[in-house]
Amino acid sequence: MELLHSINDFNEAKQVIVGGVNSPVRAFKSVKGTPPFILKGKGAYLYDVDNNHYIDFVQSWGPLIFGHADEEIEENIIKALKKGTSFGAPTELETTLAKEIISCYDGLDKVRLVNSGTEATMSAIRLARAYSQKDDLIKFEGCYHGHSDSLLVKAGSGCTTFGSPSSLGVPSDFSKHTLVARYNDLNSVQECFQKGNVGCVIIEPIAGNMGLVPAQKEFLVGLKALCEKYQAVLILDEVMSGFRASLSGSQEFYGVVPDLVTFGKVIGAGLPLACFGGRAEIMDLLSPIGGVYQAGTLSGNPLAVCAGLSTLYKIKRDKTLYSRLNALAIRLTQGLKKSAKSYNIALQTLNRGSMFGFFFNENAVCDFDDALKSNTEMFAKFHQKMLFKGVYLACSSFETGFICEPMTEEMIDLVIVKANESFDEIIKGV
């Protein structure tokens, strides 16, 4: 496999786009490689400008549960496109999508559509602070909630990939209201509550930005109880896990009903769409009926809303979708672990529905500190080997992988064969 055209494209891009990419992780810096420049995607596959094709386990970082260029979703987007790209006015489709989202998640009375996960979490926190009338928030080490200033503290994902727990340019006045607790550790949460005037707590119930690290059930249930005790708003960030891990996101696994929740990725099917929602008494503080301001020129964009509706309709029709995706994720993770074990390579694997992760680590990963102990050099070698064998994995050990509906058992088995070849070459130093 060659990447000559991608190398040239990357060099050209770096002249006019900062770092050559429009989101840092795409630069392949942590795996010391050149990112393939993508020409198109179809189903489970990506095709690059060098005529290489890859089985894609990134799926645009999660949104594409039905794979690339799904015909039904594509056709509905084209129909919507012919009616106009944006109106800046209400449409019936927005209401329909809101009803579909609400019907899937307990405790959700009303939602507000926005353009990105960052907007959703930022707005949810503003709303929670207004409701609680308290300024401090608790977040967790390794959880990523977008790139708004107060949340870029020990944020996992891209920040960790580039060796920094936070971001430059965040004023201390912002970060001083952010208390950071240890994931899966209720004692550290209790300490944070005792330190500050905490108005809200935000967490990924299935963390996907320090690698895949699910919350322990007793931890999440206990967190809800602490929020009730201290009268703090609990925000579950399900931008990644919502409609991915299951139809009801994390609730399938934990049964925890938050005060507010954020969704993104799958509900936009690859177009810019996210939302936040929760109890009516909190949501009704939003403008235009309340005093919490939030707005967006392209919020509820008809193309994105149409893509989201098409996706949710298709999900709901397919009664065995999540069980099939879960089975494929288990087949993949168990196969990878078995292959690594045969070469005496320490590998931890796990999945939640169609989300999966693996760590080159001796022990199970339960929090951010555990994730940081992983062998990132081994990951970089493995990633490079797999890429050149036609397997497109997330280019950081602190990211999550995704199964999509067009994938088959035969594809997964082929990937395991290629993983076996890769481990063999790594051990032999080839």
UniProtKB/Swiss-Prot annotation:
It catalyses: (S)-4-amino-5-oxopentanoate = 5-aminolevulinate. Belongs to the class-III pyridoxal-phosphate-dependent aminotransferase family. HemL subfamily. This is Glutamate-1-semialdehyde 2,1-aminomutase. Pathway: Porphyrin-containing compound metabolism; protoporphyrin-IX biosynthesis; 5-aminolevulinate from L-glutamyl-tRNA(Glu): step 2/2. Homodimer. GO terms for molecular function: glutamate-1-semialdehyde 2,1-aminomutase activity; pyridoxal phosphate binding; transaminase activity. It comes from Helicobacter acinonychis (strain Sheeba). Gene3D superfamilies: Aspartate Aminotransferase, domain 1, Type I PLP-dependent aspartate aminotransferase-like (Major domain). GO terms for cellular component: cytoplasm. It is found in: Cytoplasm. Its main location: cytoplasm. Its EC number is 5.4.3.8. NCBIfam families: hemL (TIGR00713), PRK00062.1 (NF000818). Its cofactor is pyridoxal 5'-phosphate. The modification N6-(pyridoxal phosphate)lysine is found at residue 265. GO terms for biological process: protoporphyrinogen IX biosynthetic process. Keywords: Cytoplasm, Isomerase, Porphyrin biosynthesis, Pyridoxal phosphate.
